[in-house]
Amino acid sequence: MKVVLVSGGVISGVGKGIIASSAGLLLKTLGLRVTAIKTDPYINTDAGLLNPLEHGECFVLDDGGETDLDLGNYERYLGIQLSRDSNITTGKIYKQVIEKERRGDYLGKTVQVVPHITDAIQDWIERVAKIPVDASGEAPDVCIIELGGTIGDLESGPFVEALSQLRHRLGRDNFLSISVSYVPIINGEEKTKPTQHAIRQVRSAGLIPDVIACRCERELDQATITKIARSCQVEDEQVIGVRNMDTIYQVPLLLEQEGLLKLLQKGLALDKCQVTPPMAQKGQALWDLWKKTVVPDRHLEPVNIILVGKYVSLDDSYLSVHKALEHSAMRCNRKLNLVSVDSEHLEPEMQEKDPRKFHEAWAHVVRAQGIIVPGGFGTRGIQGMVDVAKWARERKLPYLGICLGMQTAVIEYARNVMGLKGATSEEFSATAEHRVVIFMPEGSKEQMGGTMRLGSRTSHFKPGTEWSKLRGLYGGVDVVEERHRHRYEVNPDYIEDLEKAGLSLTSMDDQGVRVETIELKDHPFFVGLQAHPEYKSKTLAPAPSLLGLVAASSGCLDEIIEAAHKKQSSSNGVSDVTNF
C-alpha cells in the first residue's frame, strides 16, 4: 500500500482537490491503479443534509453515498468509481467507535481519541485503499488522501495524528506528503511567510512535507522558491509553483512540467512496482488523450449556455453540472460561456420587486443558445423554472432538465399544453387537484438523511424510441445506468395523458412504472432526466445528456450522435483507456 497525502495550510479553498486529482492522474499515466479518499472533520455523518450554499454540492456515488464534492473531482480526473467509505467524516468515525464501545468490543477500556479514534481512522483508510475502483476488479496500487480543512484546526487533530502514525507504520518509500500553501502577491512582491508558518505547523504535527505545492497567481520567481526551500528544510526541486491556468484541466500538465511526477516516482520508489506492458501502454495512451483534449479554448467558437437554478449564488452548488458542461464543450470544440441565473429573478413578482434583476435575468435567457435547469428542493423559484421551460419549448431552444428541472418541465407541459390549471408537484402543494409530480411511496417524510432514492439506477428505453436523441447520445442502447437523488417522481396516473398530449416518456425504471426520461420529438433538443447524469461525467467521457445539450446549442448534435453510435458498435470487448 502506497499513500500520497495532500494537506493544506494558511487557508482552505486553495485547490487541494485539484492538486490531489492531478497527482493521481500523473500516477495513472505510469500504468498504476489509483484510488482516492477525502477526510472531512465535520461531525455530520455525510454531506446529504449540508446546505449547498454553505458547503457546495452533495456528490452522489454509485452506491448511494452522499459525499463531499471533492470526490467528484477524483472520479472525473481519474475515471474511477468510488464508494461512500471513500469519504471519511468525524461523524462516521465517532459513530463506529461508539457502536463498538456499546457492543463491548473494547473490553472495558477507557475509549480515547488516542489510540481508539486514531486507530479507527487508520483501519478505515487501509480497508478502503484496497477496494477496487475500476472494471479490472484489482486492488489499487496507490491511494491519494486529501486531508480536509487546514492543519492546525482543532477539529482536524485526530486525522492529522492518525496520518502521522500511518506514515510511520508504512515507511518512507510508501508514504509521500504534499503540503499545499498559498503565496500571496502584495505590491508586486511574493510573500513567503504564510508558507513558512504553514510548513512549521505541518512539521510539528509529524507530517514532514516531501513536496511543497505553492499556489500562486503567476510563475514563482526562483529566488522565492529557494527562500521557501531553505526556510522549510527541503531542496529547491521539492518546491513547485502551481500558478493559475486557463482551465483546471491544464494543472496536470503544469505539475508534470514542474517535476511532480519525478518526485512521486522517487519518493514512492515506484521503480520497484511491477507494471505490465499493457498497463504502461494504457497509461501513455491516457496521457496522450488528456493532452490532446485539454487544449486552451481562447480561440474556439463560444457557446452560450444559461443555468437556471435555486442556489446560483455559490458556483460550487452546481459544481458537477459546471464540470460536465465544460467536458462537453471540450468534446464539441467550443468555448463554454456559462451564465447562472436565479430562477426567482425570472418570476413575475420580481418585475415589481426589482425590475433590474428581472430584466437582466430574462436578457440572459433571450441571448442563450441553450438552457439547463438542474436539481433542487423547495418552492422558492419554481415558477421561474416553469416559465423558462415554456420559453425553451415554444421557441425550440435546446433545453435539459435534471431532476427538479425535469419535474418543472412536466408541470409546465401539464399547465400550458394539457390545460390542467394549477398543475403542480406534491412537494409544493399537497392539496392541489392536479399533482403531476408526487412523493415516492417508499420515501420517508419523518427522517431526511439518507432516505431519498439514491445511487445508480437502471433506465430502460421503451420500444419505438429509436428516434430519441437522448438514446442516440448513449449509442442507441436499450438500458443505461445513471445516479439518482430524489424524493418525488412523475405521477403514474398522468403518464397516459401526458403521452397522448405529445410528451414522450422515453424510458422507465426496472418495473416500468417510474418515469426516468422525457423528450419532445418535434423539438431540436428538449430532454428531461429524473437522474443526475452530471455525477458520472468524466473529463475524457462527458455525460451523454449534457453533451447533447452543448452539441445541440452548438449545431453539431447529429455529428455527436453518429460518433456515439460508432463508439458503441466498436467498444464491445475493447478496453477504454479512460477507465482502468
From Swiss-Prot:
Describe the task this protein carries out.
Catalyzes the ATP-dependent amination of UTP to CTP with either L-glutamine or ammonia as the source of nitrogen.
Q: Name one GO cellular component term.
A: cytoophidium
**Could you identify this protein by its name?**
CTP synthase
Which CDD domains does the entry link to? Answer: CTPS_N, GATase1_CTP_Synthase
Domain Glutamine amidotransferase type-1, which positions?
Answer: 304-559
Membrane-spanning segments: none
Q: What pathway is this protein said to act in by its record?
A: Pyrimidine metabolism; CTP biosynthesis via de novo pathway; CTP from UDP: step 2/2
Keywords on record? ATP-binding, Glutamine amidotransferase, Ligase, Nucleotide-binding, Pyrimidine biosynthesis
What GO biological process, any one, is recorded here?
pyrimidine nucleobase biosynthetic process
The cross-references to PANTHER family, in alphabetical order and at most eight, read: CTP SYNTHASE, CTP SYNTHASE-RELATED
Leader sequence range is none
